[in-house]
């Protein structure tokens, strides 16, 4: 089918209703450019995670179109679409009875890569996230710190060479020092890899640090979308609240 968009991801007039009388998202219009990190900023219940689920076709829009890699999400085979996407979430989701190596190798094996390619890729991504295979490949998740588990989760998300990364507050459960360290590592990694990333957060500082652009959601609507410097100067009332919180040293609005 002919591509209908040159953008990596595009939302065109998208609405999503969880039930006839409950609108979760309304009239979303935005694009995610190739190689961009777009931060979805908002409180709990603002619709951020629903956006991710619309991208990977776990949900279908009630109206409008979600386009991924030039095709409407409904035109994608769901399995093929999801195999193009890497996922990193707050709870990591590592299999406790699998070693680090086995956790990272899981998706490439499901993709039926040959054994040598799997082994080489696991070693490569573990090095990328700062966990050399010689030291960490044989460990189990309960033998790792919280920061190390998040690094393994990121390595697993990258292992099958996805076109896109969907990240749902992946660093939210970490202590502030570890979180800042991993944010810095992720930013350097993204500068090198240039994946297309949609990253959910409720932390305005994280959005300003990691994002090429910030999309602010409030009650299912897009309030503003802009680069960090412009976001700090936004005239939008909700954006101004987030900027005020940031400048007073807090992390986020009440959830």
Predicted regions and their residues:
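Short helical segment in ABC ATPase nucleotide-binding domains corresponding to the A-loop/adjacent helical element
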Residues: 101-110, 119, 123
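Conserved ABC ATPase "signature" region
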Residues: 116-135, 188
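Catalytic Walker B motif of ABC-type/P-loop ATPase nucleotide-binding domains
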Residues: 165-168
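Conserved ABC ATPase "signature" C-loop
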Residues: 219-220
């Amino acid at each position: 089918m002919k591509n209908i968009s040159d953008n990596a991801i595009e939302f065109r007039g998208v609405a999503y209703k969880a039930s006839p009388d409950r609108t979760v998202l309304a009239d979303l219009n935005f694009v995610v450019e190739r190689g961009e990190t777009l931060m979805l900023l908002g409180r709990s219940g603002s619709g951020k995670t629903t956006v991710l689920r619309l991208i990977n076709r776990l949900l279908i829009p009630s109206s409008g179109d979600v386009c991924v890699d030039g095709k409407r999400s409904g035109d994608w085979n769901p399995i093929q679409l999801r195999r193009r996407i890497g996922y990193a979430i707050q709870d990591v989701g590592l299999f406790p009875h699998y070693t680090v190596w086995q956790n990272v190798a899981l998706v490439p094996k499901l993709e039926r890569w040959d054994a040598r390619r799997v082994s080489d890729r696991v070693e490569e991504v573990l090095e990328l996230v700062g966990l050399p295979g010689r030291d960490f490949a044989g460990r189990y998740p309960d033998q790792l710190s919280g920061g190390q588990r998040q690094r393994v989760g990121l390595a697993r998300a990258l292992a099958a060479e996805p076109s896109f990364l969907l990240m749902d507050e992946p660093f939210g459960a970490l202590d502030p020092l570890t979180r800042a360290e991993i944010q810095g590592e992720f930013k350097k990694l993204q500068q090198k890899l240039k994946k297309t990333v949609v990253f959910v957060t409720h932390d305005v500082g994280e959005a300003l640090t990691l994002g090429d652009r910030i999309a602010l959601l409030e009650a299912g609507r897009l309030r503003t979308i802009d680069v960090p410097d412009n976001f700090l100067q936004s005239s939008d009332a909700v954006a101004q609240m987030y900027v005020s919180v940031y400048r007073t040293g807090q992390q986020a609005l009440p959830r």
